[in-house]
Amino acid sequence: MSSSSSDELEERLEEVFDDILEDTYNNIVESHHNNPVRRLYIERDRETGHERLWNDYFCENSTFPPNLFRRRFRMNKDLFMHIVHRLSEDVPFFRQSRDATGKPGLSPLQKCTAAIRLLAYGSAADAVDEYLRLGESTTLLCLHKFTENIIRLFGDEYLRRPTPEDLQRLLDIGEIRGFPGMVGSIDCMHWEWKNCPTSWKGQYTRGSGKPTIVLEAVASQDLWIWHAFFGSPGTLNDINVLDRSPVFDDILQGRAPRVQYVVNGHQYDLAYYLTDGIYPKWSTFIQSISLPQGPKAELFAKCQEATRKDVERAFGVLQARFAIVKNPALTLDKTKSNMNETDTLSTIYLSLKKEMEAEVLR
């Protein structure tokens, strides 16, 4: 075959290839313009979801008894309805509205139940879709609105610093337990942050090899966590967190209520916390004796270590009641993790206080 024939064949093949490529491109462009991507709409039948939820837990002859309600909602029904009522009154998001077609939207019960289920079980956002009939993005929005407004409505009451009356009650409890002047136990816990941004992992990763966020808390015997400092990187130890913590701000700025108590005939005017051995030897921290010598020292070490476990018990209850704290944090936003943690603390003490009030009335 001559060179001229070969050149003609190559040119012809190139023309055919160019034509095929141009036709393929035009077909793709035309199909894209003719078939725009639309948002997938799923008819979830919201009314059926509300009716099922109402019949299961809230009607007069509900399917599930009160003990199962408390186990699944982590609180009794009266308290849950109180929260739903407050949110419905003060937050427009939790009020039931109608969509553009006039159909009723999600009820306050559905929205609050979705948020509580995520907090209680630490499950994925779409895990409640089949039962409550709301989508993943709506469930996450319910969770964030719930945590944000629980803190706004109840935080000042249940996450506040102790008033003079509260402080006197804590001092009385401490004296009964053999520690006059004690107002609580202080310690830290680490919450794994699964979706920590890659650029931050070095700052938040400690010896376990996983990034964590630190919660510093002061807890009393009745599990009241009246001081919570959350958000420090996991590489910090308890002393580093204490350096950043506002736990002593009221004392330094002269806003703390005055305290007076007597031990062995000596009067003191500064309350203290029970701690483990890592904390500095300040007058506001009382630690155990690592190597007690003699019966008195052994008795003191035994009582101090037992009483100090109040804060560890509070951490255990926190993780047992709300698995979202026990499981790794899935959000990319540390602020939202902070709101989830703070809301959980508020909800736990709110439920505990209501239960204690109910026991007193009985």
Where are these predicted regions, by residue range?
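Short, polybasic Lys/Arg-rich linear motifs in disordered N-terminal/cytosolic regions
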Residues: M1-R362
